[in-house]
Amino acid sequence: MKMKSLFVTILALFSTALSAHWQPVGHAEYTWGPFHVYSVGLFSETSSYQANQYPLMFSIKYEKPIEGKNFAITLIKEMEAQQLSTDDTTAWLKKMQEIFPDFSPNDLLNFVALENKGYFIANDTVLNHEFDAKFTRAFIDIWLSPKSSFVKLQPKLLGKEKDTQDHQEFRYQPASDPFDEENAMPELPPNYDPQNNLNG
């Protein structure tokens, strides 16, 4: 019974991400020295961003191999800079390190931010954990807070400075038919095994 409930939850989250009419707000490249490490894109349903606006989606496309556990540490360090509770960040780090896979070039990690929760999608797999509103706000602030260490990326991420980069690179193409909004059950990729896709 628990497995059935979990599977229904994952399908609901997957449906939310697919049925939202995502429009690009902006995107930016994160570099370290001469290396292009990843690109990050911001999407909303209005092609613009305002404070406390939901839903939002952040898409990270990796250009270099990155271990999932190390990327989780990077995110938590940014959150700790916001002076959040250590109890919160410790729990968040543990959970992200449990669910994040290792990332290869061209992999996508999406974070869908809803008003009271958020969740990650790695390529076409919903990662099995719902984060609360506090985590969701902290994740948004990593990229958009005035105190963020990524503040130099914000003009492009918010669409205030244009880039020649194509937003289509943030589109992952799963091996399934397009989502039919009239169908409450999206078609999953061939050979989809819910047991293997319940990460964490």
What residue spans do the PLM features occupy?
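Terminal leader/tail segments of proteins
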Residues: A20-G200
